[in-house]
Design a protein with these regions (language model features):
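Conserved ATP-binding/catalytic motifs of P-loop helicase motor domains
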Residues: 1-155
Length: 155
């Protein structure tokens, strides 16, 4: 997607919360980008790809929300069933884990669009099935069959 946007003459910036994720995507950390382009300057990109969106804390989303009226396009990716931000609070009040996932800001930034990928293409299908079953709140596997993967315990 980024290659296509750039081929069409769009300037695309890529951010993520962690160094590892931002480096893997070819970008920089969200904290650095926000300090440089929102707090201490102005962004000149046409499209901002925010990866691992569930890891960004409310402080970063407050800063990014300032860009909603600039005409900037947002490409948002992540999995809300993974890590949530640590210590995510606003004025001393903890933010519920699903607050951003169900927010109007997410809907606005995404332009009302949502694409949910449900087919595994990068790992073992059986493991993916097991992980996916945990997300929905119950394992479809019997406990005895899972115990074969547990390391032996010494008493």
């Amino acid at each position: 997607v980024v290659e296509r946007l750039r081929a069409n003459g769009k300037r695309v910036d890529i951010i993520s919360k962690t160094h590892v994720a931002s480096n893997r995507a070819g970008g920089i950390t969200a904290d650095h980008w926000v300090r440089r382009h929102v707090i201490n300057g102005a962004s000149s990109c046409d499209c901002l790809w925010v990866d691992e969106i569930s890891q960004l804390d409310v402080g970063l989303w407050l800063q990014l929300s300032k860009l909603t009226y600039t005409g900037m396009q947002f490409l948002l990716s992540g999995d809300f069933n993974q890590f949530s931000p640590k210590g995510n609070s606003f004025r001393g009040s903890m933010i519920p884990e699903n607050a951003f996932e169900t927010s109007g800001l997410l809907h606005t930034l995404a332009g009302g669009n949502r694409l949910e990928l449900v087919e595994c293409r990068r790992s073992d299908a059986e493991l993916f099935g097991f992980y996916s079953s945990l997300i929905t709140g119950g394992s479809r596997f019997e406990l005895a069959s899972l115990m074969q993967f547990a390391p032996p315990r010494s008493c």
